[in-house]
Amino acid sequence: MNKFNIENLDLFYGQNQALKNINLPIPAKQVTALIGPSGCGKSTLLRCLNRMNDLIEGVKITGLVNLDGNDIYGNIDVADLRIKVGMVFQKANPFPMSIYENVAYGLKAQGVKDKKVLDAVVEKSLRGAALWDEVKDRLKSHAFGLSGGQQQRLCIARTIAMEPDVILMDEPTSALDPIATHKVEELMETLKKDYTIVIVTHSMQQARRISDKTAFFLMGELVEHDDTQIIFSNPKDDRTQGYVNGDFG
């Protein structure tokens, strides 16, 4: 079953067309990797999935992005969409507050005040982000005291505290060391049991390790998408073969 169906999607930044007639299904509860060289459109597409591109002046979008059969560019509440489709950015962006308050922030913003409810969600979310055992004795400590990898997992915990259906990840490990990267990748493998994950990555090795599906973009076009194993071992398009072989990038 598909979580997203993208049909005939075009996106323009002013006169520059950044996405060209994209047609892509994104299956539920799997990891889909978006790959391609810098400027190919993969991050632009990712931002289409929760309408982050709306924040950029001069953007024009045509086509359909259906989430569970509903057009997200139709008559919907964008704030609700961004709860349902959470996002983890390239650089960890914990809020300037305690570990506990970071995770509880979204719930409090929605008016949740019951401490038992907040405590339960904070613990569940930190466990879900594989961070609880590392921070359970210092929840009141400032989030900036965590390592880079811990901060990124805290941001994941903050995202899943809002109970999204989808988690978008824009190069979430590019600023992390190999050990922290491995922990986040292990976490993605666990999270996909409950969430649909779409990740942008420049690392071919990472895409191959963690994703079920891979989509290759080049100059705003979707060249090919298939099972990850096929994309890396037997792609249909010579351009895909050249990219995964490292012939260009």
Curated annotation (Swiss-Prot):
Q: Does the keyword Calcium apply?
A: no
Q: What is its EC number?
A: 7.3.2.1
Q: Which UniProt keywords apply?
A: ATP-binding, Cell inner membrane, Cell membrane, Membrane, Nucleotide-binding, Phosphate transport, Translocase, Transport
| Membrane topology summary | Peripheral membrane protein
| Domain ABC transporter, residue spans | 4-244
Q: Where in the cell is it found?
A: Cell inner membrane
According to its UniProt record, what is one Pfam family this protein matches?
Answer: ABC_tran
Do you know which PROSITE patterns this protein is assigned to?
ABC_TRANSPORTER_1, ABC_TRANSPORTER_2, PSTB
Q: Which Cys residues form disulphide pairs?
A: none
Q: Which GO terms describe its biological process?
A: phosphate ion transmembrane transport
Q: Which Gene3D superfamilies match?
A: P-loop containing nucleotide triphosphate hydrolases (3.40.50.300)
> For this protein, what reaction is catalysed?
phosphate(out) + ATP + H2O = ADP + 2 phosphate(in) + H(+)
NCBIfam families per UniProt = 3a0107s01c2
Which family does this protein fall into?
A: Belongs to the ABC transporter superfamily. Phosphate importer (TC 3.A.1.7) family.
Q: What PANTHER family does UniProt report for this protein, alphabetically? A: ABC TRANSPORTER I FAMILY MEMBER 17
Q: How does it assemble?
A: The complex is composed of two ATP-binding proteins (PstB), two transmembrane proteins (PstC and PstA) and a solute-binding protein (PstS).
Q: Which named protein is this? A: Phosphate import ATP-binding protein PstB 1
**From which lineage does this chain's organism come?**
Bacteria, Pseudomonadati, Pseudomonadota, Gammaproteobacteria, Vibrionales
Write the gene name: pstB1
